[in-house]
Amino acid sequence: MFKYTLDNKRYHTLNYYNKTKYGCKVFKVSLNAGFSCPNKKNGTGCIYCYNGSGENDGMDLLTQFNKVRDNTLKKWPNAKYIRYFQAGTNTYADVNTLKSKYEPILKLDNVIGLNIATRCDALNSNVLDYLEDLNNRTDLIVELGLQTIHESTSILINRGHTLEQFEEAVLELRKRNINVVVHIINGLPFETKEMMLNTIKYLNKLDIQGIKIHMLFILKDTPILNLYNTTNFHILSKEEYIDIVIDQLELLRPEIVIHRITGDPIKELLIEPTWLLKKFSVLDDIDKEMVKRDSYQGKRIQ
């Protein structure tokens, strides 16, 4: 039986991590603080990124938080909450601006942690020192978008930073004992299965605490749609995606927490792949295939 499970999952789920650490139901509340992105300053940003207004765009942070909390209190009166600054690059500002966004939320009842999604090129020394201070006062996770280790793909998708910058950011965060979660994307244009597995092998050697695995999806009004229309690059089928994800899980240390294993595209904007709209079917099929293969996270680590 896989060590890190309470429900027969064969990978280390975020649900397991939260239940064993906090002993109660934990909700992650996604917040939009209105941050921009350095990669959009002088260009279009990453080619798969949709530039429309994000969820809760323009709504103050306290209202955003209460909207979710009020919907959960009746069923889970003892629940705890993690604030997730998700939209944009959430350290792309001076420290005083960051404090104005983060500090009021820290004071709310039953808030036990803070997740900050950002980029490795938006972590200067002042920001890093402030994050260290936050980490001493709450359970802090910093999420970094890597997507791929391959330079050719990085240039194609206009990621806007180098692998060396990413490594340096991980080192600086870990020097401050800040937990790091890394985002990767499977199915990026022209990447092979071997390339996707090599991204996981690289991450498995780093001092990271979690990972989010996404499937590339193509949305309306994004530059990647133009690339898809002109090159017709291969979009992974559900079966191909599941096969790759399971192989990736087998190459990951069991203690690395899997925060996400598929995506949540906006239905009205999605062009491809439409199978992503059936999220729970994808998750169920991953579980079934892992049982069929007698697979589990870390199985192939020597």
PLM features: what roles do these ranges have?
Residues 46, 106-111, 198-213, 282-297:
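Structural recognition of alpha->loop->beta junctions
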Residues 65-70, 99-103, 128-132, 166-170, ...:
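Generic structural signal for well-ordered alpha-helices
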Residues 2-16, 22-27, 210, 218-302:
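Auxiliary Fe-S-binding modules of radical SAM enzymes
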Residues 1-82:
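N-terminal [4Fe-4S]-dependent radical SAM core
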Residues 52-68, 72-95, 110-123, 139-165, ...:
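Core AdoMet radical
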Residues 95-103, 124-135, 157, 196:
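Distinct, well-ordered alpha-helical segments
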Residues 164-223, 239-262:
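Conserved C-terminal portion of the radical SAM core fold
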Residues 72-76, 102-109, 129-139, 171-175, ...:
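Acidic (Asp/Glu)-rich catalytic clusters
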